[in-house]
Amino acid sequence: MTQLYETMYIIRPDLGEETVDQVINQYQSLLRDQGAEDVQTQHRGKRRLAYEIRKFREGIYVQMNYKAAGPLVANLQRAMRLSDEVIRYLTICQDEPDTDVEAATA
């Protein structure tokens, strides 16, 4: 059964633009190759962190929204945990959006 997920991850700020694009494409490909649907990626850019993580005060934020099964999400998180480029990640399961908007507003 597929669920709607959102994964936000932070990439090291000292990486070049080309390397950042490779990292983003790597995780998009991982999701698509394993059967994820509706993979949408938003590159949020470099931002200051609230606190220091692995001696970095800034990070490059990337957000991915997708539909996938639970085991696929576990594989994605494992890949991020083992990666040197990703300094932090968080995945949340989202509720399906209401398809009947009129019933919700009535």
From Swiss-Prot:
Entry similarity comment: Belongs to the bacterial ribosomal protein bS6 family.
InterPro entries named among the record's database cross-references: Ribosomal_bS6, Ribosomal_bS6_CS, Ribosomal_bS6_sf, Ribosomal_S6_plastid/chlpt, Transl_elong_EF1B/ribsomal_bS6
NCBIfam families hit by this protein: S6
Keywords noted in UniProt: Ribonucleoprotein, Ribosomal protein, RNA-binding, rRNA-binding
Pfam families xrefs: Ribosomal_S6
GO terms for cellular component: cytoplasm; ribonucleoprotein complex; ribosome
GO biological process terms, semicolon-separated: translation
One GO molecular-function entry: structural constituent of ribosome
Gene: rpsF
Designated name of the protein: Small ribosomal subunit protein bS6
CDD domains linked to this entry: bS6_chloro_cyano
The protein's role, per its UniProt record: Binds together with bS18 to 16S ribosomal RNA.
Entry-linked Gene3D superfamilies: 3.30.70.60
Organism: Cyanothece sp. (strain PCC 7425 / ATCC 29141)
